[in-house]
Amino acid sequence: MLSHRCVEILPRSGLQSGVSFFSDPLPSDATLIAEVPPSEQPQLFCHRRQTDQLMVLRGSFDLIVLQNRQLRRITLREDEATWVRIPAGVPHGAINRSCHSVVIVNAVLQHGPSDPRDYLPRPVPRSLLTQWEALIAGDD
């Protein structure tokens, strides 16, 4: 049985019309365009009452999620367009290894008012520090 707090990877769907692709919309309360700058010191964040639904529009980055007491790397790229749904309560962060900002869309689902603590970095659990450092370094 899957937990309601599992990260999901969803295929992009839509309509190809000539040279243009029109993506099907995801249900959301707000749609945000964000830039993820090159990362020197990536950090984890955790939204208490918000589900993020992310897709890369330009560039690529590694999304790191902390789930079931394990760190997981999910590489998101513009040429492999997929949605990643990160439920509320799942710590996550981005590692942009390029020298350019990555542009993403976030189809946000709100489950209540935002909490100022959602935007404060969370510590990486001590037992996962070695794995965290390897992920930052780009080691598998």
What are these regions (language model features)?
Residues 1-83, 99-140:
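Non-catalytic, conserved peripheral segments adjacent to functional cores
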Residues 94-97:
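Asparagine-centered strand-capping/turn motif at beta-strand->loop junctions
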